[in-house]
Amino acid sequence: MLTAEDKKLITQLWEKVAGHQEEFGSEALQRMFLAYPQTKTYFPHFDLHPGSEQVRGHGKKVAAALGNAVKSLDNLSQALSELSNLHAYNLRVDPVNFKLLAQCFQVVLAAHLGKDYSPEMHAAFDKFMSAVAAVLAEKYR
């Protein structure tokens, strides 16, 4: 459960991400592919080389979905319902991968934002990403 303070910190953090969504999203995907090569199996039709147009495009989609979730912190289930359906029923992505990508996204934030990514912000964003992963996995039950 996100507290009022968590929501405030998440919103502040996302303001820092604005303008870097494609960059951060694609870098998070690249990190995931390197650290967890088994995740590449969900992208057989992608050119997975660093900086490829497909990875940049999907990274932008990931970051946009997270941005949409940030705007709907009080109703993540509704905000992510279509995405949950897509990943559960069409793409059949193993839900563990949501947590892997969340971890990689946090590494990207820490690397780019440095001191602006405070321990409090990190903790709040970790709770947020856990909530997002849980919502995306809801349809698997």
From Swiss-Prot:
Entries under CDD domains matching the protein: Hb-alpha-like (cd08927)
Distribution of this protein across tissues and organs: Red blood cells.
Tree of life domain: Eukaryota
Function: Involved in oxygen transport from the lung to the various peripheral tissues.
Record domain Globin: where: 1-141
Residues binding heme b: H58, H87
Assembly notes: Heterotetramer of two alpha-D chains and two beta chains.
Pfam families given in the database record: Globin
Sequence similarity: Belongs to the globin family.
A GO term from the CC aspect: hemoglobin complex
A molecular function GO annotation: oxygen carrier activity
Record-linked InterPro entries: Globin, Globin-like_sf, Globin/Proto, Hemoglobin_a-typ, Hemoglobin_oxygen_transport, Hemoglobin_zeta
PANTHER family linked: HEMOGLOBIN FAMILY MEMBER (PTHR11442), HEMOGLOBIN SUBUNIT ZETA (PTHR11442:SF41)
SUPFAM superfamilies: Globin-like
A biological process from GO: hydrogen peroxide catabolic process
Keywords: Heme, Iron, Metal-binding, Oxygen transport, Transport
UniProt protein name: Hemoglobin subunit alpha-D
